[in-house]
């Protein structure tokens, strides 16, 4: 794999850290309601690793490089927050184990699932996480968005 090229002076100036008028409330919101996380963050499928949350950890552990705009780096940090989250009464989301979020609504007879993710291993891991921490329920409806 080729090493990334350094930022040009123009890019460095454009991406220089600065006050963008954003506070840390978004980080508090992104973490609010987290109940649990996948034990390893690595979701295995029949063809190998389907998702690996640790591959996104670098955005939380390192400084913004001069090749990335500060607002994009911040968005990547917010997106790196993962796990099972309480959203509202009888509504939970699993975030950060696919390119989208999966929502679980506690129905009278089981889970109503909204947006079942893009691959089965991630959806299975999300369902397992919900069942483990919220109680085992069957899936009774799936809504694709």
Q: Predicted segment positions?
A:
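Metallo-beta-lactamase
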Residues: 139-145
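Conserved beta-strand hairpin/beta-sheet module of binuclear metal-dependent hydrolase folds
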Residues: 77-137
